A protein has these predicted regions:
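Internal helix-turn-beta structural module
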Residues: 257-330
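Active-site bordering "gate/hinge" segments
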Residues: 1-188
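Active-site lining segments that contact anionic ligands and/or coordinate catalytic metals
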Residues: 188, 205-207, 214, 239-243, ...
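Short, glycine-/Ser/Thr-/acidic-enriched flexible segments
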Residues: 57-59, 100, 162, 196-199, ...
Length: 331
């Protein structure tokens, strides 16, 4: 990677974060320390034109021994200013995960099988996907009311006048989603997520269920109800939704506890507690942005999505003629 940057006339700068070292730093960290660290890295980030993030590790639960309070200090005083506020907004960036045996294990695949899967999902024809997404973007931009029905789910909200954004291989790799945000106080009903979620505290949350009233999560349960409510009590915005997105990558069909993959699952949607994106703003601010996924294909219980009372997707398959180009058989 360094050689390639030099070849095109760039000046590479390298941050090499070892997960074990990061864990030890965070276990006893304090606010003053993290602010100073962020100040240094933020100064460098402001000088950068582009950012390439390559993630990988051998243990996805490395941070499980870090106290929640310390993780929150890191998120608030390092991740938010350096990445969410500077890197995301002001650099040309891309993030991907390097395929490792640990990732293969998460996906319940052999290393060889996962390697083939990895390059297939990452290297699909993004130009074709981008063109196919245009009709969905246009429809979402015209939509007011969204209704989602499924196993343990009966949810309504509005996306009126909040822009829809297509993601087709320009930033996250793999890619394949179209996102917007609900009007902050418009969300009402019940939502049951059926994909496990590995949070940055190293714990895997399962069987997550939220009850919403006027946008706020008023009840939350999971395999560790106390723990998930502690996350949602991080700040006021953590109990409101910052993103609604439809996953359309035809080669990703099951969760593997890696959000770069899981949020793109064909026939899924994610409904994200926490901060919104500037591209699709609904005014919600939080130090968290937690993509939680619900899969609506037949193998995962099915479900229906309606835009302004018109059925647009059933059991993970688009049923409106203008959107059928996004279905798996067209790739």
């Amino acid at each position: 990677m360094i050689k390639e940057v030099y070849k095109v006339g760039g000046n590479p700068f390298v941050w090499n974060h070892n997960p074990q070292i990061m864990r030890e730093l965070l276990k006893e960290c304090n606010e003053e320390q993290i602010k100073l660290w962020a100040e240094s890295d933020l100064a460098l980030m402001r000088k950068m034109d582009a950012y390439i993030g390559i993630w990988g590790g051998s243990n996805n639960a490395e941070n499980s021994s870090v106290r929640r309070e310390n993780n929150q200090i890191y998120e608030k005083f390092y991740s938010n200013p350096v990445h969410m506020h500077e890197r995301v907004k002001n650099t040309k960036w891309v993030i991907l995960n390097y395929p490792t045996p640990s990732m293969a294990q998460q996906a319940s695949m052999s290393s060889d099988e996962f390697e083939d899967f990895y390059f297939k999902v990452c290297n699909l024809d993004y130009s074709k996907m981008s063109k196919a997404m245009d009709n969905l973007v246009e429809l979402m931009d015209k939509t007011d009311k969204v209704k989602i029905i499924g196993d343990g789910t009966d949810l309504t909200f509005s996306i009126k006048n909040i822009k829809a954004i297509k993601c087709a291989g320009e930033m996250n790799i793999p890619d394949g989603e179209v996102f917007t945000a609900p009007i902050r106080e418009s969300v009402n009903g019940i939502l049951s997520y059926n994909a496990p979620s590995l949070y940055n505290d190293g714990f895997t949350y399962e069987n997550i269920k939220f009850e919403f009233k006027d946008g706020k999560i008023i009840k939350a349960t999971a395999n560790d109800t106390k723990r998930i409510n502690e996350i949602l009590d991080t700040d006021e915005g953590a109990r409101y939704i910052g993103e609604f997105s439809l996953g359309v990558n035809p080669y990703i069909t099951k969760p593997m506890k890696d959000i770069l993959f899981d949020e793109k699952i064909m026939g899924s949607f994610h409904f994200t507690p926490g901060s919104c994106y500037d591209e699709a703003p609904n005014g919600n601010k939080s130090i968290i942005h937690w993509d939680l996924v619900c899969i609506q294909t037949e193998n995962y219980g099915g479900g229906e999505i309606y835009f302004d009372d018109i059925l647009i997707r059933k059991n993970g398959i688009f049923v409106v003629d203008s959107l059928k180009c996004l279905n798996p058989e067209n790739y």
